Amino acid sequence: IYVDSGILRLESGILTGNKCEDVDANGVDRGGAVGVRSGTFIMTGGEITDNTCDAGKNGAGIYVYEGPSVTIGGNAKIYGNRTADGMNSNLSVGNGESSSTIINLSTDSPLTSEAKICIRVSTDSNGKQITTSCTDLKDVFVSDNDSYEITTKDGEEGIFYTKKNLLAAVPHHPLQHLTI
């Protein structure tokens, strides 16, 4: 499904088994199930799972080009989508996002703990705010990129996409002297 204007609503059902391979007449080469170039995509239920795209591409589930409006709510599930070479590629947000947050949360159908949103954001997005609220539902969001994690910040509302501190994750081992 390609969104170039207007509104696409997904309230129930499953988008599965789709594949985005080559650039089509609209210049779309991403978004196995949904490609959002402009317009609005609202997902308050249903699942987007088991879709694929070419190796090295993003958005086997949903690819959001710069600037569009994405609203998530209810028990929406975006998971299990992969590139041809096996990389997790669920909800991917491209470079040049125009707003300070990546996802708007639905006020008509509030996000629930049953939702599952796996996400990958452009590589220069350390500290990018995913949502402006729902810190209690942080675990609904999962990073597709092993170098990033979903976090909250003390004293700030919202959920963030943050580069992992890999040095903090490595245990410190004192040097051991070997006797030969």
Language-model features and meaning:
Residues I1-Y2, K19-R37, T52-Y65, A84-G96:
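Extracellular beta-strand/beta-solenoid scaffold signature
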Residues I14, S38, I42, E47, ...:
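A detector of low-complexity, intrinsically disordered, Ser/Thr/Gly/Pro/Ala-rich segments
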Residues I1-D4, G31-T40, V70, N90, ...:
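Extended, compositionally biased low-complexity polar/Lys-Gly-rich tracts
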Residues S5, E21, T44, E66-P68, ...:
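Generic signature of intrinsically disordered, low-complexity segments enriched in small/polar residues
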Residues G6, G39, G155-E157:
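Beta-strand-connecting loop/turn residues
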Residues I7-E21, T40-T52, S69-R82, N104-P110:
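Right-handed parallel beta-helix
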Residues V23-D24, T49-T52, G56, N126, ...:
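Intrinsically disordered, low-complexity regions of eukaryotic proteins
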Residues G73-I180:
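Extracellular/surface-exposed low-complexity segments
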